């Protein structure tokens, strides 16, 4: 850092952050070199300002992959690209299926696992959307299986709920209106991955239906 004297006599600290990309090691294309240098500069600004650093291809590739995953995640949310598979829960007494657990999977090849989806939802502050979609889409799947006679209709439905999240009043009312037939068969399981939130847990209990 350097200190400069302004025309009014005041002192101001001045520092410079910069990024460097090399020709031809990083690229032979001028626009690509500028993009790489900009990326290096922004990495300095994110970490510790007042330094100059060289372009890191490995870091750039990792950043590009993370950006693409975030794009895919929001596409998945906006288009509701989820499937809820029903895992049967069998009675030890007579071997009959008395319940199903709805297991979330993403419908995009690069984003299928629940842990991936929940991690991105946490980073992008979209846990509420996952909670809402899980409640609605799992119930929709139950209704579809019932209408196509793939289930009897008296089975319970276990749904994984995020501990810190709950549907708002309007969402809860819409849920009950659409799936009133299912209200006495829903079993809410609180996920252990998320921190417990007493307010959210109370809101879940107070939801209509």
Q: Where in the sequence are the language-model features?
A:
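Catalytic core of bacterial c-di-GMP phosphodiesterases, primarily the EAL and HD-GYP domains
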Residues: 96-99, 127-201
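Short beta-strand/loop segments at the ligand-binding rim of alpha/beta enzyme cores
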Residues: 204-209
